């Protein structure tokens, strides 16, 4: 049986063997608080590659040490961190998948002992510290840090870069009027609030020629915040700069109630795709092969990002293929166990 979920997908100069992406998820497992890859990361990502995920995306990886969400996050702020990341891409590639990395800065949501930095001195909530409002020099240094991180990503062997512009972290903070109250060229109008991301993309393009994704929070879930229609305009600007795919998540820029249900964010991937003609990724409570297949067949997204379901079962692609009646080409080491997988779901 043919399956769109298991059909190849080419984006720029990279061909994925299927449309399943391991969504970036922080593992908080850099045990020495130095940003380094550990054996856990090698097994964690390598296993999903062996499980036949098409694109394995490494978790939010900090471009500056002070830009980590926690002390145990992965980092890419120094050349001495390349070796561990290169081992990770080798594990992924050797097991048949392409490798991506999400480049990130936590902004005001950095839970470290040092200062947090943000476009404006507004805390996320009353339990978190008041961040330092970034000056122009700090903004320029952060943009340069993203560029250097992109170059290190190339040296580490990654095929795809994703810029983390969602979930209330630094890029998202500049984009949203809820968190950006600046009166200089980086605040005020949508064009000015986009300027930080624009300059990051320009700087990354100088050193990286592979596919670039951007993860967005397509809805602030606040009456004064951004909606998916605002992100249509942002996406048009990103597309003009050469961005290849928009990974459509939502929320977390400010505390808000979100109604969560299966595929609750697919609507954003569909809307962005329809109104900008750019490739999109759908993410959020996508847990079965038939659900993923339907999203693709309905032309609501181009790639399917799987998160917690891959934590529950690193061999999700095999189960999805079984569900869809698709014969999956597995590692030769596993061919002694042919036939259907029986689950209790």
Curated annotation (Swiss-Prot):
Ordered alphabetically, the record's keywords are: Detoxification, Flavoprotein, FMN, NADP, Oxidoreductase
In short, the EC number is 1.6.99.1
Q: Name the Gene Ontology molecular function terms of this record.
A: FMN binding; NADP binding; NADPH dehydrogenase activity
Matches recorded under SUPFAM superfamilies: FMN-linked oxidoreductases
Q: Which InterPro entries match?
A: Aldolase_TIM, NADPH_DH_bac, OxRdtase_FMN_N, YqjM-like
The role this protein plays is: Catalyzes the reduction of the double bond of an array of alpha,beta-unsaturated aldehydes and ketones. It also reduces the nitro group of nitroester and nitroaromatic compounds. It could have a role in detoxification processes.
User: What family is this protein classified in?
Assistant: Belongs to the NADH:flavin oxidoreductase/NADH oxidase family. NamA subfamily.
Whom does it interact with, and what assembly results? Homotetramer.
Which NCBIfam families does the annotation name?
Answer: PRK13523.1
What is the name of the protein in this document? NADPH dehydrogenase
User: What organism does the UniProt record list as the source?
Assistant: Bacillus cereus (strain ATCC 14579 / DSM 31 / CCUG 7414 / JCM 2152 / NBRC 15305 / NCIMB 9373 / NCTC 2599 / NRRL B-3711)
Encoding gene (name): namA
């Amino acid at each position: 049986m043919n399956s769109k979920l298991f059909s190849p997908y080419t984006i720029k100069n990279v061909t994925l063997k299927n449309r399943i992406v391991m969504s970036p998820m922080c593992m908080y497992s850099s045990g020495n608080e130095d940003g380094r890859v550990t054996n856990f990361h090698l097994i964690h990502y390598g296993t999903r590659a062996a499980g036949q995920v098409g694109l394995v995306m490494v978790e939010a990886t900090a471009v500056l040490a002070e830009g980590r969400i926690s002390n145990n996050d992965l980092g890419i702020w120094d050349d001495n961190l390349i070796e561990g990341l290169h081992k990770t891409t080798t594990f992924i590639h050797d097991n048949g998948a392409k490798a991506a990395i999400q480049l990130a800065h936590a902004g005001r949501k950095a839970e470290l002992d040092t200062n947090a930095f943000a476009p404006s001195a507004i805390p996320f909530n009353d339990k978190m510290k008041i961040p330092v409002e970034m000056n122009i020099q700090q903004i320029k240094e952060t943009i340069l840090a993203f560029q250097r991180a992109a170059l290190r990503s190339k040296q580490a062997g990654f095929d795809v870069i994703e810029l983390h512009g969602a979930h209330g972290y630094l890029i998202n903070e500049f984009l949203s009027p809820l968190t950006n109250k600046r009166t200089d060229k980086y605040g005020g109008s949508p064009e000015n609030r986009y300027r930080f991301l624009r300059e990051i993309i320009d700087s990354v393009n100088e050193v990286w020629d592979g596919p670039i994704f951007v993860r967005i929070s397509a809805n602030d879930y606040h009456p004064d915040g951004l909606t998916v229609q605002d992100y249509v305009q942002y996406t048009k600007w990103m597309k003009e700069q050469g961005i290849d795919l928009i990974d459509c998540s939502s929320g977390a820029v400010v505390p808000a109630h979100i109604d969560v249900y299966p595929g609750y964010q697919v609507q954003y991937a569909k809307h962005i795709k329809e109104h900008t003609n750019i490739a999109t990724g759908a993410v959020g409570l996508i847990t079965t092969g038939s659900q993923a297949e339907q999203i693709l067949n309905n032309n609501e997204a181009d790639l399917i990002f799987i998160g917690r379901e891959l934590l529950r079962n690193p061999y999700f692609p095999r189960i999805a293929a079984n569900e869809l009646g698709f014969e999956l080409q597995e590692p030769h080491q596993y061919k002694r166990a042919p036939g259907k997988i029986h689950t209790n779901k």
